[in-house]
A protein has these predicted regions:
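Non-catalytic, polymerase-adjacent accessory regions of viral genome-replication enzymes
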Residues: 1-70
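Conserved polymerase palm-domain catalytic core
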Residues: 72-75, 79-94, 98, 130-289, ...
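Duplex nucleic acid-engaging cores and interfaces of nucleic-acid transaction enzymes
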Residues: 110-118, 144, 152
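A glycine-rich phosphate-binding loop feature that marks nucleotide/adenosyl-phosphate handling sites
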Residues: 242-245, 281-291, 349-353, 370-378, ...
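Short, solvent-exposed helix-loop connector elements
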Residues: 135, 206-210, 316, 332-346, ...
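A conserved non-catalytic segment of reverse transcriptases
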Residues: 274-342, 353
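Extended C-terminal regions of large enzymes
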Residues: 385-435
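Core structural elements
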Residues: 35-40, 87-90, 98, 200, ...
């Protein structure tokens, strides 16, 4: 009798339920689900929606669609089933981080993006069952805003001694043998393990290639033991991690000081176990109750301030100045590369940059930063329009706000919206939204 087919969402739910109910279970025979047409097509649609840059082979989604998506997926499945599939080298791209530093992004070819995405679709429910509630980065139904709200709550619970941790080149330094061993604790399928190893090795001798669909899942898995170790102190402490960005909050008491020191020791031990070191120059234990006490987490500067209006103390978080500089630099570069475009098309590219930035940073105490960005973005767009019309200045009298935000369509929603605390809980994702 032929077994009835099940859709991908149901398959993922079944895998997750089995992983949750039997924490020691090792999954085997799941490679067959990766090479299924439904899995590969779902991974393809996710990759296409994200529309990343081409890999080293220059292949684009437009070319694949023109030649035939069915043939592309069929050839990929054939290679995977026959064992002839080989990942292509990553294309490296450097992204400025500010202060003269850069972050290296590894861009896989589209075919490799699809295969990695298919692996993630099948492995994700296995490891999601094991992951800690303290981990928020790149996980289904979780967000940076949820992590931010938990830190805010911790500060309002008077946990004012902060362990501010900086992991040195986290993604670049993770040992392959350690991450493969962690995958192997749950997955006993040699073909999957071999594929994961191939993807790691094609990125170099160490590290997890940033920019690949598999990297967030593996990065979370690498620190999962640390998450569970610190979770044992939850209640007295607050621990929140978003990929390699983490913070520990404890009461500013004698007991709290001991717990903070021990937490830092444990973080150092777990990081060393996977080949990563702590940046001792940037990692510190500080008191928010002392003058000048502040730390950085998820792009925000956190302070404990007293309201001049009510006299109450509260967690004050504002965007890092570097984040403001960075978004304005990106807008400038976009306009510099858009001189051949029509005004509305050039503005739409700017909107794609500032909309995401504003939606992320509009929580907390960001009113000043938001208005600063709005002013300078409008100024840059006006200057761009003046140059296109071969005029000087910024056209403050020539073009009204109705023209800039109406006819040109420049994004203008820079209002602060306080985070909805009722949504801190995890929201169930759909398949296409899971990567």
């Amino acid at each position: 009798m032929t077994k009835p087919t099940i859709d991908l969402q149901e398959l993922r739910e079944r895998i997750g339920q089995r992983a949750k109910s039997t924490p020691t279970h090792k999954f085997w025979g799941v490679y067959v689900h990766i090479v299924k047409r439904t899995t590969l097509e779902a991974a393809y649609l996710i990759a296409k929606r994200q529309n990343g840059a081409p890999g080293c082979d220059g292949e684009t989604f437009a070319r694949i669609e023109e030649a035939g998506r069915d043939e592309f997926l069929r050839d990929l499945a054939t290679e995977l089933c026959s064992g002839t599939y080989q990942p292509r080298p990553y294309r490296r791209r450097e992204i400025p981080k500010g202060g003269g530093r850069v972050r290296t992004i590894s861009i896989p070819a589209i075919r490799d993006r699809v295969v990695q995405g298919a692996i993630r679709l099948i492995l994700e429910p296995i490891f999601e069952a094991d992951f800690s509630d303290s981990s928020y980065g790149a996980r289904p139904g979780r967000s940076a805003h949820q992590a931010i709200e938990l830190v805010r709550q911790g500060l309002h619970q008077r946990k004012h001694r902060v362990v501010d941790v900086d992991l040195s080149r986290y993604f670049d330094c993770i040992r392959h043998d350690r991450i493969l061993a962690k995958v192997g604790k749950r997955v006993q399928d040699k073909r999957i393990l071999a594929l994961v190893k191939q993807f790691l090795k094609s990125g170099g001798r160490r590290g997890i290639p940033q920019g690949s669909p598999l990297s967030p899942l593996l990065a979370n898995l690498a620190l999962n033991d640390l998450d569970h170790a610190l979770d044992r102190g939850q209640g007295f402490l607050t621990y929140v991690r978003y990929l390699d960005d983490m913070v520990v909050l404890v009461p500013d008491s004698e007991k709290g000081r001991r717990w903070a020191d021990r937490a830092l020791e444990r973080i150092s031990e777990e990081a060393e176990a996977i080949g990563v070191s702590i940046n001792t120059e940037k990692t510190r234990v500080l008191s928010m109750s002392e003058a000048g006490g502040k730390f950085v987490f998820l792009g925000f500067v956190w302070r404990w301030k007293r309201s001049p209006r009510t006299g109450r103390w509260y967690a004050y978080l504002s965007p890092r100045p570097e984040k403001v500089t960075e978004v304005l630099r990106r807008v400038r570069n976009s306009l510099d590369n858009s001189r051949h475009l029509r005004m509305r098309d050039a503005v739409e590219q700017v909107n794609g940059i500032v909309r995401g930035w504003a939606n992320y940073f509009r929580v907390g105490n960001a009113a000043h930063a938001l208005q600063k960005v709005k002013y300078h973005v409008e100024r840059k767009v006006r200057r761009f329009a003046a140059r296109k019309s071969k005029r000087g200045g910024f056209g403050w009298k020539r073009w009204s706000s109705e023209v800039v935000y109406g006819a040109w369509g420049l994004y203008g929603d820079y209002q602060v919206r306080y985070f909805n605390r009722a949504k801190v809980g995890v929201q169930p994702p759909g398949i296409i939204n899971s990567l």
